[in-house]
């Protein structure tokens, strides 16, 4: 089965700084395209979408331009770039004007789980996210489970924007806490302009003793809520390596979904990504 990875990261510490890596020594080194290709080897990953990795703000524009150049190179699967952005800023539109126009630029992400809740609730933030529609860009939502009501409000105010919820809304997998995450997901899934990325969950599991069964209730509820036409596979590499290899995560998700049949698995691992991220 061909795979489109809708959530890969790269970071080059010789070029840019990512302050959050200081607290994660396992990840605090450069991860470049050759490393990604080695991790995905043999898994038939035919395309990928790069998600910004919360680069320090002074490097946002340079990182985006660097990734767009990389996406144009012929020897890698990069088909789309989701760039870093600050919708809470009054200068957001001028920032967008500097990066739009490249066909591989697909969307914007602002990591909210590291920010005060007021950031995602702000009037300027919501107005600027709503404006992404006019740029032809989507928005990746990256929040903790407790912040999902913020995501629900945001989506309700931006009916024309394509939204992708990253990491199933970051449930507490290790602690096996399903509620209130479960009801929030059910509510968010009512908005048909939102898709859910089945990604990141293995990184939130117990790194020493996780199994596919630990992930299953979260994955099955997300899929049941959004349906097979609005779920996407993402590796979250290299963050997934905190608990599992790229291959281990893929095989766990394939095992969890094998009873759904080949057509639905193909939607999850490939077809939906083409539509949601507007890939070739």
Q: Where would I find each of the regions flagged by the language model?
A:
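Mid-to-C-terminal alpha-helical segments outside catalytic/metal-binding sites
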Residues: 1-4, 29-47, 221, 225-232, ...
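An N-terminally biased module of ancient metal coordination in phosphate/nucleic-acid-related enzymes
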Residues: 1-68, 251
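A generic "structured core" feature
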Residues: 2-11, 15, 41, 113, ...
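Conserved, mostly hydrophobic/aromatic
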Residues: 7, 48, 67, 81, ...
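Active-site environment of divalent metal-dependent phosphoester hydrolases
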Residues: 11-14, 55-58, 88-91, 113-116, ...
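Short, electropositive alpha-helical surface patch
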Residues: 58-77, 164-165, 215-224, 247-256
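Active-site gating/metal-coordination segments in enzymes
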Residues: 61-147, 153-155, 197-201, 208-209
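Catalytic pocket-lining loop regions of alpha/beta-barrel enzymes
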Residues: 121-232
């Amino acid at each position: 089965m061909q795979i489109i990875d809708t959530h890969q990261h790269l970071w080059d510490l010789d070029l840019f700084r990512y302050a959050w890596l200081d607290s994660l020594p396992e990840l605090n080194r450069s991860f470049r395209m050759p490393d990604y290709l080695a991790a995905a080897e043999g898994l038939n990953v035919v395309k990928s979408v790069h998600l910004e990795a919360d680069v320090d703000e002074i490097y946002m524009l340079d990182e985006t331009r660097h990734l767009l150049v990389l996406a144009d190179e012929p020897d890698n699967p990069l088909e789309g770039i989701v760039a870093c952005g600050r919708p809470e800023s009054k200068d957001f539109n001028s920032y967008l004007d500097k990066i739009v126009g490249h066909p591989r630029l697909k969307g914007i992400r602002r990591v909210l789980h590291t920010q005060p809740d007021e950031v995602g609730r702000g009037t300027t933030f919501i107005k600027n996210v709503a404006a992404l529609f006019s740029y032809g860009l989507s928005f990746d939502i990256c929040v903790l489970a407790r912040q999902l009501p913020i995501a629900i409000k945001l989506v309700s105010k931006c009916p024309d924007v394509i939204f992708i919820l990253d990491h199933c809304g970051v449930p507490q997998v290790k602690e096996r806490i399903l509620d209130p995450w479960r009801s929030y997901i059910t509510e968010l899934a009512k908005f048909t302009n939102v898709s859910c990325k089945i990604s990141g969950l293995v990184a939130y599991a117990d790194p020493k003793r996780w199994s596919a069964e630990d992930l299953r209730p979260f994955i099955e509820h997300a899929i049941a809520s959004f349906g097979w036409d609005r779920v996407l596979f993402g590796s979250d590499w290299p963050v997934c390596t905190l608990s599992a290899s790229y291959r281990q995560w893929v095989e766990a998700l394939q095992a969890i979904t094998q009873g759904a049949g080949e057509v639905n698995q193909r939607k999850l691992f490939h077809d939906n990504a083409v539509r949601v991220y507007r890939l070739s």
